[in-house]
Curated annotation (Swiss-Prot):
GO BP term, pick one: reductive pentose-phosphate cycle
Keyword set includes S-adenosyl-L-methionine: no
UniProt keyword Magnesium, yes or no: yes
The protein, known as: Ribulose bisphosphate carboxylase large chain 1
Positions of substrate binding: 125, 175, 179, 296, 328, 380
Molecular-function GO terms, alphabetical: magnesium ion binding; monooxygenase activity; ribulose-bisphosphate carboxylase activity
Similarity comment: family membership: Belongs to the RuBisCO large chain family. Type I subfamily.
Enzyme active site: 177 (proton acceptor), 295 (proton acceptor)
Length: 486
């Protein structure tokens, strides 16, 4: 694109009237971002007839200091410093009419340690700007100076494993089904059977809070009774994610405190409670030595569409800053949205100390995490024991594998479903540790384990090779190609 700055300088810059954004200082192709700049990558789709550079400069302006006309009060500020600067515009491969806009923001534009303030600028009014057909925030580079103003995950992967005394394998969980309608007593029964059968965790679903069929306090009491009985029966540390999501912060704190009094080691919140509430609960969780699970309920309303919204990789970065310990991050092989390479990028953001740029995973920037704790990704939605070798290969061992229907839908009952998943996992971990090619030998390994485990045999028979093979709506724009040797 045009690599010449056309910024109007001097007194002409502040003459009353309307001026193109690219002439107001929001397009600076010669700008070299500072180490302390926040950098955002937007996918910009201008309306027909709108100059792409002007559209991208407008995004920079409207997400920082600009308004629709020149204002003389700009002269009362360090305007040159505080203007966001679009310094690079390039076409999106394979998407005619869309452009990547790289925009740098001075660190002083953002309140330290506040996701709400960051998002008010980056995804605020600019997303409704008329000259744009669509706008999507694809990725961000968050400088170390900014990262260090955040708490980060309240517990982190290492300490969570130490508390659970479980190492060297994925953790296993299940969401209680049906998610709505059970009484407290029957809900607790599901929790007990699943934990006794071999799972590490059970979990509330996103929309179970406090309804006429089951008050939250009743659910907490029955669930923790089940956890304690399962721990006594198995000799293992168990947990259940008690959803404390509620109408007000006061209600959420009350529920979290009650969970703590009952001896729970983990609570749960939903993404829909908002960024400030998430950070508040993360702060409470660290203070009270509680693992904090985040269900990403609602994210697909703005992460799933390729042209407009916010990429989940950005949400994952924000949530690592905010301080949650678990986040649902996709399964690749399950029923929910998840391109393999894109999902790997999400998992890397959660679990690495440093994320190098990997365009094939949709990661556009190097990202240093400045010693923030690692975030445990959670895989859930349409997975079952027959996919264990694929899940271990694709997602690694620092992950919670949530088999909801794949546990509770077992023909022999909940405990049998849990046992099937645990035996499948243990068989695959043993094969991996022995150096076997468990990815290609996976079906054979599972079949052999099933010879001495009736629940696993039945699980493999009923679900066989069930998969949800639909084309992903959000896949990387850059695909690695093999270069022939000279």
């Amino acid at each position: 694109m045009n690599d010449q700055s056309i910024t109007v300088r001097g007194k002409d810059r502040y003459k009353s009237g309307v001026m193109e954004y690219k002439k107001m200082g929001y397009w600076e192709p010669s700008y070299q971002p500072n180490d302390t700049d926040v950098i955002a990558l937007f996918r910009v789709t201008p309306q027909d007839g709108v100059d792409p550079v002007e559209a991208c400069a407008a995004v920079a302006g409207e997400s920082s200091t600009a308004t629709w006309t020149v204002v003389w009060t700009d002269r009362l500020t360090a305007a040159e410093k505080y203007r966001a600067k679009c310094y690079r515009v390039e076409p999106v491969p394979g998407s005619p009419g869309s452009y990547f806009a790289y925009i740098a923001y001075d660190l002083d534009l953002f309140e330290p340690g506040s996701i709400a303030n960051l998002t008010a600028s980056i995804i605020g009014n600019v997303f409704g700007f008329k000259p744009l057909k669509a706008l999507r925030l694809e990725d961000m580079r968050l400088p170390v100076a900014y990262v260090k103003t955040f708490q980060g995950p309240a517990t982190g992967i290492v300490v969570e494993r130490e508390r659970l005394d479980k190492f060297g394998r994925p953790l296993l969980g299940a969401t209680v089904k049906p998610k709505l309608g059970l009484s407290g007593r029957n809900y607790g029964r599901v929790v007990y059977e699943a934990l006794k059968g071999g799972l590490d965790f059970t979990k509330d679903d996103e929309n179970i809070n406090s309804q006429p069929f089951m008050h939250w306090r009743e659910r907490f009491l029955y669930c923790m009774e089940a956890v304690n009985k399962a721990q006594a029966a198995t000799g293992e540390i168990k947990g259940t994610y008690l959803n404390v999501t509620a109408a007000t912060m006061e209600d959420m704190y009350e529920r979290a405190e009650f969970a703590k009094e009952l001896g729970s080691n983990i609570i749960m919140i939903d993404l829909v409670i908002g960024y400030t509430a998430i950070q508040s609960m993360a702060k409470w969780s660290r203070k009270n030595d509680m693992i904090l699970h985040l269900h990403r309920a609602g994210h697909s309303t703005y992460t799933r569409q390729r042209a407009h919204g916010v990429s989940f990789r950005v949400i994952a970065k924000w949530m690592r800053l905010a301080g949650v310990d678990h986040i649902h991050a996709g399964t690749v092989v399950g029923k929910l949205e998840g391109d393999p390479n894109t999902t790997r990028g999400y998992y890397d953001i959660c679990r690495e100390d440093f994320n190098p740029m990997r365009l094939e995973h949709g990661v556009f920037f190097d990202q240093h995490w400045a010693s923030l704790n690692k975030l445990m990704p959670v895989a859930s939605g349409g997975i079952h024991a027959g996919q264990m070798h694929q899940l271990l290969d694709l997602l690694g061992e620092d992950v919670v594998l949530q088999f909801g229907g794949g546990t509770i839908g077992h023909p022999r009952g909940i405990a049998a479903g849990a046992t099937a998943n645990r035996v499948a996992l243990e068989a695959m971990i043993l094969a991996r540790n022995e150096g076997r090619d468990y990815v290609h030998e996976g079906p054979e390994i599972l079949a052999k384990a099933a010879m001495t485990c009736t629940p696993l045999r039945e699980a493999l028979e009923i679900w066989k090779d069930v998969t949800f093979n639909y084309e992903s709506t959000d896949s990387p724009d850059f695909v690695p190609t093999v270069t022939p040797a000279a």
